[in-house]
């Protein structure tokens, strides 16, 4: 098997260059509702950039340096913006019934990202390294033990740090790339009011 040929054929089969890097959009995309997906994506970019800076200088420097405090706050507030945007995003997509015409993959993939982002957020709060986070980790571990997931030790700071900065971050990045690929491949769903009218 030739991997490059396989990739070439798969990309060519599913996406043109205009799909991948569109220069035009349907008129109905000129609506404020479409801003929420972009806002989610932008806040995620800020989360990743500030998170990489936080992780770069070790697990606690953000508690005792002014640059660390600032970066930590940027990371925290980007997460707040992310959750507000993603909630508005999927609410808008729900009222547009954006899963229509085979877009169920984007819809299911979106819920997967959302579910993983909850675990990512929880693991983030456990990295505060204070009494509050220790209390939460201690209380939360019983729920995981009850689910048979006791191998995930939420009381171990290093495990939680790795889960947060490697495991969940990687899953979210991969699923977001898939999300955007599906959107580019399928194009934005048509408004409900116009459905079927063009064919008559
Ligand atoms: C990290 C989280 C997410 C990011 C970065 C993201 C980003 C985007 C972007 C940029 C678009 C294209 C622009 C737009 O239509 O607004 C889009 C479309 C879409 N998203 Fe998301 N999204 C996320 C989570 C979700 C969730 C949780 C759902 C629902 C459960 C969802 C469902 C959809 C659907 C169905 C579309 C296609 C809309 C259409 O065809 O018009 N997304 N997303």
Predicted segments with their positions:
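Membrane-embedded alpha-helical bundles that constitute the cytochrome b-like, heme-associated redox core
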Residues: 1-200
């Amino acid at each position: 098997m030739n991997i490059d040929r396989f990739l070439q054929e798969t990309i060519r089969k599913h996406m043109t260059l205009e799909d991948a890097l569109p220069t035009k959009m349907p008129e109905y995309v000129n609506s404020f509702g479409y801003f929420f997906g972009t806002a989610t994506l932008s806040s995620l970019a800020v989360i990743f950039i500030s998170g990489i800076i936080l992780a770069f200088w070790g697990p606690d420097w953000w508690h005792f340096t002014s640059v660390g405090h600032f970066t930590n706050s940027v990371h925290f507030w980007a997460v707040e913006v992310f959750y507000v945007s993603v909630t508005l995003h999927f609410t808008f997509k729900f009222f547009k019934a954006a899963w229509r015409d085979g877009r169920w993959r984007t819809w299911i993939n979106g819920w997967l990202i959302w579910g993983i982002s909850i675990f990512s957020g929880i693991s983030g709060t456990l990295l505060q390294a204070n009494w509050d986070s220790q209390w939460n980790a201690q209380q939360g571990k019983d729920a995981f033990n009850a689910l048979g997931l006791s191998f995930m030790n939420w009381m171990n700071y290093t495990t939680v740090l790795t889960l947060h900065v490697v495991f969940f971050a990687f899953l979210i990045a991969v699923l977001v790339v898939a999300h955007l690929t599906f959107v580019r491949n399928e194009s934005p769903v048509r408004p409900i009011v116009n459905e079927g009218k063009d064919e008559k």
